[in-house]
């Protein structure tokens, strides 16, 4: 590692720590090494579960997953925050309590089934310990917002019978509430924890291995080679590389402080305003979570919640994601034109072809993963195979580098490829056998041992990265458990439906505001789970297709990280851009306009998310409806960009910008004759632009 690269890595960790107490590396102390190896064991356990090397009852598997999260999370938080001896001891006590709960769930699994509905005193004690340890871990890791929200739901379950109608319920005994929240599959160990223990953890590990293997460098070099030389190339590199990296990164905020270390200074150096540079990076990094084929962790929870294949979620997200990044590209292009910013020079750009020639093998696991997902395999199977192939490529590369000639290396890769294809006939165990042989071989020489160390570090880093996601999933299960027990979702849903009877648009705005307010203090995953559980059924009752209603909630949960006053992704970019987080947030909202507009358009015309239904599809047919709504969205985004930036080949007068925004708004609105008005205003605007250019050229 060069000194410059080491400095950049250290700077990235320092910035990440401002937003994530677990961002720093494992300390070199004895405690740090113990936690490092505990993280490795955690990852190996999850891989063994995914590959069915270890088969546990679903309830036990979830409990052990949460036990690992607490056992690793508390001590790491104590080290990361520099706690003194008393608080450190308390953290270790809470970690031990979390392990004890997992052990109790495992040992008492069968007796607990027989005692369902009639818990004894130890059940209640361990149930309370489970709730307390998860609440405290979430508070320490993510701040008070999510624990307070979950605490209010818990208080509602215990005391809601004292509220006035229609918010009251029949009342539930303390024992019943504890059993609902701490046992079974509708509380802490509900669907979110199941998804965390399977899909999410596996894909976080997959991303960790790819990052260690050099995927960030590959994405950056390819992006530079493809768009770096074009007008505003520095910002376009940010949009492309951050969006690509966001597809394999579990956190948009982490992506900001990782890729932003390179892209934000690059944009500033080529003339972009600091606030705009930070806004572009924040927008692109958050957009990675909605970009198929490998979307953020929420996509897996959505598929599991809706009971649909992952490919259906990908299909619904495809067109909106393309529009999101097309809008970002358009905005940075206009900003560059307005300020006369050129692309990068040839000397500063790597060759995209050379980058792919050198790192093409890194794309193979991602390609196989995508193929498996699109072929109907479960995300768990696809993620396991993708992770195994990544490990094989990393280890195989280390072995191939020591071979004497190109011919021998070619033969080696052919043989390894044939061995990898054996999983079609013999399953994952064939890949595990090949991996075992590669590990033993790498252990026999120095370069191989260094590669094994990289894999070991990837296992540890992946487990650490999964901690906030897993703990958030466990805690948000409290809300699901309370809503299932009390039927609280029906109360809010009836309110949404009553509003929607008069105006569907007002119902959508209310849901959007709920998502954004919740997202100001809690991560995307619990935000989605809460709002989809409460508002999703209501939107469905109003005639919104199921997957469209969930995508609506999903989008605004992500966009909450760009929305002031909290705007976590923007404040993560602030120290890099050396600009106010609020200023960056306002710029990010402009760049991310598509993210705010497309969900509304999709509700009225589901064809935008490649879904059946809607008046337009019924009138003109499915594919004509898709083409029409995409065209309308593109025109609206183009007009919005021209209005906001104030430039379209030339500076725009204020009245021209007013016409542009009026045309964009009427194209987006789903009211009688608004399309006709929008296209008429667009035609007027186009004539004005044509006349203006004619006068300039004359």
Task: State what each model feature region is.
Residues 1-114, 124-128:
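Conserved, well-structured core domains of diverse proteins
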Residues 80-83, 102-117, 141, 161-175:
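Transmembrane alpha-helix boundary signature
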Residues 121-125, 186-199, 225-238, 270-276, ...:
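Membrane-interfacial loop-to-helix junctions in multi-pass transporters
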Residues 220-288, 294-301, 307, 524-556, ...:
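Hydrophobic transmembrane alpha-helices that form the pore/transport pathway of multi-pass ion
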Residues 123-126, 168-180, 193-197, 315-320, ...:
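Loop-to-transmembrane alpha-helix initiation sites
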Residues 2-33, 318-464, 568-668, 693:
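Long, contiguous bundles of hydrophobic transmembrane helices that form the permeation core
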Residues 207-211, 242-251, 283-289, 373, ...:
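Transmembrane alpha-helix interface/packing and boundary motifs in multi-pass membrane proteins
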Residues 136, 140-141, 151-166, 174-178, ...:
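Core transmembrane alpha-helical segments of multi-pass membrane transporters/permeases
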């Amino acid at each position: 590692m060069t000194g410059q690269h080491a400095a950049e890595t250290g700077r990235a960790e320092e910035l990440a720590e401002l937003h994530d107490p677990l961002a720093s590396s494992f300390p070199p102390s004895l405690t740090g090494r113990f936690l490092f190896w505990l993280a490795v064991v955690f990852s190996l356990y999850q891989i063994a579960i995914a590959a069915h090397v270890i088969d546990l009852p679903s309830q036990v598997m979830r409990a052990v997953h949460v036990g690992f999260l607490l056992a690793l999370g508390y001590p790491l938080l104590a080290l990361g925050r520099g706690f003194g001896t008393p608080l450190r001891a308390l953290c270790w006590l809470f970690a031990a309590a979390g392990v004890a709960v997992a052990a109790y769930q495992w040992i008492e699994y069968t007796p607990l089934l027989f005692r369902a509905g009639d818990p004894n005193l130890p059940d209640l004690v361990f149930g309370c310990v489970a709730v307390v340890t998860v609440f405290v871990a979430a508070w320490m890791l993510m701040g008070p917002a999510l624990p307070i929200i979950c605490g209010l739901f818990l208080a509602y379950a215990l005391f809601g019978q004292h509220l006035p109608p229609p918010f009251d319920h029949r009342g539930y005994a303390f024992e019943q509430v504890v059993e609902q929240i701490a046992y079974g599959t509708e509380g802490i160990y509900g669907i979110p924890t199941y998804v965390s223990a399977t899909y999410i953890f596996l894909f976080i590990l997959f991303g960790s291995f790819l990052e260690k293997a050099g995927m960030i460098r590959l994405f950056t070099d390819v992006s530079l080679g493809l768009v770096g030389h074009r007008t505003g190339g520095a910002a376009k590199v940010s949009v492309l590389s951050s969006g690509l990296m966001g597809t394999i990164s579990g956190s948009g905020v982490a992506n900001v402080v990782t890729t932003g270390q390179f892209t934000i200074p690059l944009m500033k150096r080529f003339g972009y305003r600091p606030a705009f540079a930070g806004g572009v990076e924040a927008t692109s990094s958050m957009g990675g979570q909605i970009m198929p084929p490998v979307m953020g962790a929420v996509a897996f929870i959505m598929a599991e919640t809706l009971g649909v294949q992952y490919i259906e979620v990908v299909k619904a997200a495809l067109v909106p994601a393309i529009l999101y990044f097309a809008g970002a590209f358009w905005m940075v292009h206009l900003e560059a034109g307005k300020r006369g910013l050129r692309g990068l020079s040839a000397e500063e750009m790597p060759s995209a072809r050379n980058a792919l020639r050198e790192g093409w093998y890194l794309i193979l696991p991602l390609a196989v993963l995508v193929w498996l997902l699109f072929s109907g395999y479960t995300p768990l199977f696809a993620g396991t195979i993708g992770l195994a192939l990544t490990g094989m490529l990393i280890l195989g590369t280390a072995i191939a580098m020591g071979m004497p000639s190109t011919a021998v290396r070619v033969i080696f890769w052919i043989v390894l490829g044939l061995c990898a294809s054996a999983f079609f006939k013999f399953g994952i165990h064939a890949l595990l056998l090949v991996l075992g042989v590669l590990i033993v071989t790498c252990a026999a020489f120095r370069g191989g041992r260094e590669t094994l160390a990289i894999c070991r570090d990837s296992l540890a880093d992946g487990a650490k990265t999964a901690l906030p996601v897993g703990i958030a999933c466990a805690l948000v299960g409290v809300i699901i458990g309370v809503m299932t027990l009390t039927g609280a979702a029906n109360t809010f849903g009836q309110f949404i439906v009553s509003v929607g009877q008069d105006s569907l648009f007002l119902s959508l705005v209310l849901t959007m505001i709920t998502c954004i307010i919740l997202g100001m203090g809690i991560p995307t995953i619990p935000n989605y789970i809460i709002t989809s559980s409460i508002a999703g059924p209501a939107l469905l009752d109003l005639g919104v297709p199921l997957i469209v209603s969930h995508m609506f909630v999903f989008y605004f949960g992500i966009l909450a990280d760009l929305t002031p006053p909290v705007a976590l992704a923007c404040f993560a970019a602030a120290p890099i851009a050396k600009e106010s987080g609020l200023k960056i947030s306002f710029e990010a909202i402009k760049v991310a306009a598509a993210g705010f507009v497309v969900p509304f358009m999709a509700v009225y015309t589901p064809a935008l998310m490649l879904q059946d239904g809607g008046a337009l599809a019924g009138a003109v047919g499915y594919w004509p409806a898709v083409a029409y709504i995409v065209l309308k969205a593109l025109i609206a985004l183009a007009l919005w960009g021209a209005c906001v930036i104030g430039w379209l080949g030339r500076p725009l007068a204020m009245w021209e910008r007013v016409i542009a925004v009026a045309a964009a708004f009427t194209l987006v609105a789903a009211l009688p004759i608004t399309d006709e008005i929008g296209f008429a205003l667009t035609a007027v605007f186009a004539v004005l632009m044509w006349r203006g250019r004619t006068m300039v050229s004359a």
